Amino acid sequence: MINFSSFFRIIQNLKKTQWQTLIGPVLILIILSMMVLPLAPFVLDVFFTFNIALSIIILLVSMFTRHTLDFAAFPTILLFSTLLRLALNVASTRVIFLNGHNGTHSAGRVIESFGHFLVGGNFAIGIVVFVILVIINFMVITKGSGRIAEVGARFILDAMPGKQMAIDADLNAGLIGEEEAKKRRLKITKEADFYGSMDGASKFVRGDAIAGILIMVLNIFGGLIIGFFQHNMLLGKAAEVYTLLTIGDGLVAQIPALVISTAAGVIVTRVSTNQNVGEQMISQLFCNSQVILLSAIVLGILGLVPGMPNIIFLVFTVSLLSLSWWLSRKKNNIKKNVLISDSKYKSRENSISEASWNDVELEDPIRIEIGYNLIPMVDIQKKGDLLDKIRIIRKKFAQEIGFLPPLVHIKNNINLKRTSYQIFIKGVEVGQGTCFYGKYMAIRSGRETEPLPFKEVYEPTFGLSGYWIDLNFKNKAEKKGYSVVEASAIIATHLNFLISKHIDELFGRQEAQQLLDHVNLEMPKLTEDLIPNIINLTILHKILKNLLLEEVPIRDMRTILETLSEFSIDQKDPNELTSLVRIALSKIITQKLFYKKDIIEIIGLEKNLEQLLLDNLKGQNNTIEPSLFELLMIKTQEAIEKQKLINAPIVLLVTHPLRFFLSKILRKKFPELTVLSQFEVTDIKKVKMTSIIGS
């Protein structure tokens, strides 16, 4: 009883420690044991059967795999299967030499059956069949798959920089998150490792084929010597027994080798899609009824040649004609269903009903209108990913800015060009562009080596030049240094840019209330004391909108509300309260504008001009003389151009009383300019004025 309880305890511990990890070491021990220890014929039959079953499983898995990386362990499995076959060859050779003189059954039933059944009693035929199998495996399948793996590894490595840049572009545009970027980079690394491993693993199979020929020769001559000299067998009898066993041994090892070589060829030649190999072959071979019809005609003509087996050709011709008719009928039914759907849709349009309040449509905060050819981008059944990219944009926006933007509504506009799209903010068109579904845009990155043979276009977001290219040109463009992105990414990047530019328009009272309700869950005491006892929702909304207008994130609601609680008792002006909140958020503002910069290069204001502006504001109720205004615009333009030349931030640093006023009047003409007060830059940063706006 004690022994049984100990045994069950060991089994339970194996379950807890993931027994799968023991398979590799155990398999290696078994293979080494087969090479060293003598095996009984029955055990040899078991291992030969296991080898055949393993090769069939590997082939079927490779056939049903949809993506290459789904079977990433294949190179390792190829190594183990090759070692297993070689170990079986060693073990079977030992058994044949030790027991071969007792008859063909002495080496096991599997070897004997392969020797008798496949050879058919003729040793010459057996040798020829064995040599043909080895030639097919060595010269055709293994050599071809090895070359494909070698070229695939080279192209995968060459394409890695381009793929990495595309991932970085999606990440910088906010189309993907950090986790998704890590997954894509890991996938690229795995692909390179896989094809590199396959390049080396194919050498195992070629070496196995060569070893099979040498082992066959050694077994035949070794068997003749042992049978004739040691066991006093007649030379003819020894040749009969040992040749049959050797050929049976060779065939039972080479057939699984041929199957696994075929699996290797399937793995490296397949194209990664959502279909397995069988589905790809059927869908692509039998997709065109005209091709099948022409094949039937050619086959029928060949069947009329005198001496041909007419019945067989006739059967295949009729079969192909039937298949062509069925495919053509299926295609016509699909077209007919589409026409019926269109007619039903038009009939519904023609039935006019009375107007009602249901016909009154409220304006969407954010709307994208797309042309007919871009509809597949939002069709989930056609693998359209634009909706997923928009969800990622909204989520990233909420995490970085601090509030959830409104939903994006997408509709088809039949009046647009088929490849065009428009983006609306509260019913006003703020952007438009052209996209081609199924194509990619190769954007100039500054590292490209040569232009592409396509019409040059401009990316709608930043005006970068590029080319619309087909999928089969994607790898070439990446190798030439272009950043290649898909069509849906162009629209998503454009949308993300426009949302950022109109962020204050999207933050209404409804969003302010939703944000306040969300903050109330975390800080109920702070919100209850402040709103509506000290300030109301209208003032809070105005303050937050002022911050968003100048692209200041409102994530840190704790600091914002605490600052308002401190100063809003005596101060009710939203603009003044906004200035105080900005000072409290100075670390966030500084980090956003000058990330990882110890010395910040900014635009300064000459003291005489600064004093002139202060005096002008005090005397004329926050207005400025036209001549002074014109001078300010000219000097600001010059300073901005200088900042651009030295690649410095376009930031103007002024005294606190001037900040709000200058930001308001300069923002309209210079939207890229950020105006800060001296209190909004943290003390840890060293300020260097690289441009001066002077009188």
From Swiss-Prot:
Write the record's keywords in alphabetical order, separated by commas: Bacterial flagellum biogenesis, Bacterial flagellum protein export, Cell membrane, Membrane, Protein transport, Transmembrane, Transmembrane helix, Transport
| TM annotation in the entry | 23-43, 44-64, 71-91, 121-141, 209-229, 247-267, 285-307, 311-328
Q: Which N-terminal stretch is annotated as signal sequence?
A: none
* One record GO biological process: protein secretion
Q: Keyword Cell membrane: yes or no? A: yes
Q: Does the keyword Heme apply?
A: no
Q: How does it sit in the membrane?
A: Multi-pass membrane protein
Gene3D superfamilies (UniProt xref): FHIPEP family, domain 1, FHIPEP family, domain 3, FHIPEP family, domain 4
Q: Name one Pfam family in it.
A: FHIPEP
| Subcellular location per the Swiss-Prot or TrEMBL entry | Cell membrane
Purpose: Required for formation of the rod structure of the flagellar apparatus. Together with FliI and FliH, may constitute the export apparatus of flagellin.
| Protein name as annotated | Flagellar biosynthesis protein FlhA
Q: What is the lineage of its organism?
A: Bacteria, Pseudomonadati, Pseudomonadota, Gammaproteobacteria, Enterobacterales
